[in-house]
């Protein structure tokens, strides 16, 4: 791989990771990915974002193929996640006089990544840089998808460098200008759902900031650049970032059961909540896809999670659910745990602790009962429901 010219003075100097199959532990990347870095070779030289550690030698070779022995004057850091900043410490050693241009938050994070001194400029204070024939304007875009994020606009070429926004884990076989085949759009949507969907409000705010810019190219930090599909890509992001219309108040109940006892209570809780005027639905966890569970929780006003206690713990399917829930989306919602036990009953309080750590609003205690629930336990459950509904 080598540098690729995008237009006069502007080059892609990123790297391709065609063998990547899992990103950030949580994403499947069957089409690989790219770590995009861009270089403006003008009177002054600017690099926009770097690449993941492990690809530095290839990255530096691409840089030098464009600028030779010229120095780099500016390193623009739009976002400090390690796939974009992992090689920063080596690049700064190569070009120690370069000024690092970033948001204040990014500068703070970089100090803990580079662990060395570097020259820096606050992008929001300088607002723009004149490189000679090219000007870079900086646009704050916080929480897309980190607090430090910003966009960079090359005014003369009408190129918007968007960091992760409108990016995609998709490694083209040829040019970085190749916009992909039929399999590209599903990967772009998957990327949005996993990375950007918790920040829909900020997606809309970011799109509002760029709506009046003339755009001939959108250059994200992953995947191909957008040239012929700019309008469509922006439109899709608007569509995907729409907040759902408020639904009827509802409680979603998810449970796992060993001998049926936690299931009996799950169904009783569902019936009682419905009787008291709030819509409730009950689901056996192992009958569902995780993405469907996550979506139901995101659309719910309240969540109940049930598990028996086995070997002093709740069982794994419940922990799988509780490790898939996004606190950014669900904080402040009502949630509680319930379940049957035989010996000591640690499962329910352990689930309650997890719900609290996810920023759910919880009652003081969950609902736990020994073995098979009967009239006494159902009466306690009805009081539990009253308290829970009060949190909605």
UniProtKB/Swiss-Prot annotation:
Function statement: Catalyzes the four-electron reduction of molecular oxygen to water. In fact, functions as the terminal component of an NADH oxidase (NADH:O(2) oxidoreductase) when using NADH:rubredoxin oxidoreductase (NROR) and rubredoxin (Rd) as electron transport intermediaries between NADH and FDP. Is thus able to reductively scavenge intracellular dioxygen and is part of an oxidative stress defense system in C.acetobutylicum, an obligate anaerobic bacterium.
Binding site residues for FMN: 257-261, 337-364
Record's protein name: Flavo-diiron protein FprA1
InterPro entries referenced in this protein's UniProt entry, alphabetically: Flavodoxin/NO_synth, Flavodoxin_CS, Flavoprotein-like_sf, Metallo-B-lactamas, NADH_oxidoreductase_modular, ODP_dom, RibonucZ/Hydroxyglut_hydro, Rubredoxin-O_OxRdtase
Species of origin: Clostridium acetobutylicum (strain ATCC 824 / DSM 792 / JCM 1419 / IAM 19013 / LMG 5710 / NBRC 13948 / NRRL B-527 / VKM B-1787 / 2291 / W)
Primary enzyme class: oxidoreductase
Expression induction: Up-regulated upon exposure to O(2) (at mRNA and protein levels). Repressed by PerR.
A Pfam family matched in the record: ODP
An individual GO BP term: oxygen metabolic process
């Amino acid at each position: 791989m080598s540098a690729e010219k995008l237009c006069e003075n502007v080059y892609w100097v990123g790297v391709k990771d065609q063998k990547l199959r899992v990103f950030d532990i949580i994403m499947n990347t069957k089409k690989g990915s790219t770590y995009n870095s861009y270089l403006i070779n003008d009177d002054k030289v600017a690099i926009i974002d770097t690449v993941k550690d492990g690809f530095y030698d290839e990255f530096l070779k691409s840089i030098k193929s464009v600028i030779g022995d010229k120095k780099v004057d500016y390193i623009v850091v739009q976002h400090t996640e390690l796939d974009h900043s992992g090689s920063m410490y080596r690049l700064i050693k190569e070009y120690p006089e370069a000024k690092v241009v970033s948001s204040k938050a990014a500068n703070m994070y970089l100090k803990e990544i580079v662990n060395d001194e570097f020259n820096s400029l606050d992008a929001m204070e300088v607002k723009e840089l004149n490189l000679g024939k090219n000007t870079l304007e900086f646009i704050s875009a916080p929480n897309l998808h980190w607090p430090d994020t910003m966009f960079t606009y090359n005014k003369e070429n009408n190129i918007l460098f968007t960091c992760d926004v409108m990016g995609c884990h998709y490694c083209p076989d040829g040019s970085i200008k190749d916009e992909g085949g039929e399999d590209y759009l599903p990967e772009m949507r998957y990327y949005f759902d996993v990375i950007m969907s918790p920040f829909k409000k900020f997606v809309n705010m970011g799109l509002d900031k760029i709506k009046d810019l003339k755009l001939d190219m959108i250059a994200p930090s992953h995947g191909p650049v957008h040239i012929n599909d700019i309008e469509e890509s922006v439109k899709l992001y608007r569509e995907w970032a729409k907040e759902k219309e408020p639904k009827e108040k509802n409680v979603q109940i998810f449970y796992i059961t060993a001998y049926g006892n936690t299931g009996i209570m799950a169904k009783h809780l569902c019936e009682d909540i419905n009787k008291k005027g709030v819509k409730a639905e009950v689901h056996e966890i192992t009958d569902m896809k995780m993405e469907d569970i996550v979506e139901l929780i995101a659309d719910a006003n309240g969540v109940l999670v049930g598990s028996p206690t086995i070997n002093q713990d709740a069982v794994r399917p419940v922990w799988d659910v509780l490790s898939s829930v996004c606190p950014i989306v669900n904080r402040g919602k009502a949630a509680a745990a319930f379940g049957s036990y035989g010996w000591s009953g640690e499962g329910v309080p352990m689930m309650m602790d997890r719900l609290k750590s996810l920023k759910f609003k919880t009652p003081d205690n969950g609902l736990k009962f020994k073995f098979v629930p009967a009239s006494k336990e159902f009466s306690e459950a009805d009081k539990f429901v009253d308290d829970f509904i009060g949190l909605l």
